[in-house]
C-alpha cells in the first residue's frame, strides 16, 4: 500500500476547520450562571436562583423522539383493553415475592 502524504498546509487547514466547528458546538451549549459572592443582596440571589433554574431547565429538558418509545409502551400496558389482557403475562396471586 502506498501512503499518500498530504502537504502540511492542507493538514493545517483541516485542523483549523475542525476547531471552528468545535467552537460552534461549544457556543451552542448554554453557559452556567456565575454564583454571586457571599455578601450578595437578596435581589442578586433571587436573580441568580432564577437564572440557575432556567439553566437547569434547559440542560435537563425532555427530548422527544426515539427515546420516547418506552413511555409509549408503558402507557400501552397501563391503558389496555380487556381484549388485550389475555396477552399480558399471568402472575399468580398466592405467591409472595419476598
Swiss-Prot record:
Subcellular location per the Swiss-Prot or TrEMBL entry: Secreted
The entry's keywords: Amidation, Cleavage on pair of basic residues, Hormone, Phosphoprotein, Secreted, Signal
Site, as annotated: Cleavage: 30-31
PTM note: The peptide YY form is cleaved at Pro-30 by the prolyl endopeptidase FAP (seprase) activity (in vitro) to generate peptide YY(3-36).
Positions annotated as propeptide: 68-98
A GO molecular function held by the record: neuropeptide hormone activity
Record PTM Phosphoserine, positions in chain: 41
Record has Secreted as a keyword: yes
Modification Tyrosine amide occurs at: 64
GO annotations of cellular component type: extracellular space
GO biological process, alphabetically ordered: eating behavior
Keyword NADP assigned: no
Signal peptide positions (record): 1-28
SMART domains in alphabetical order: PAH
Top-level taxon of the source organism: Eukaryota
Function according to Swiss-Prot or TrEMBL: This gut peptide inhibits exocrine pancreatic secretion, has a vasoconstrictory action and inhibitis jejunal and colonic mobility.
Record's protein name: Peptide YY
Gene that specifies this protein: Pyy
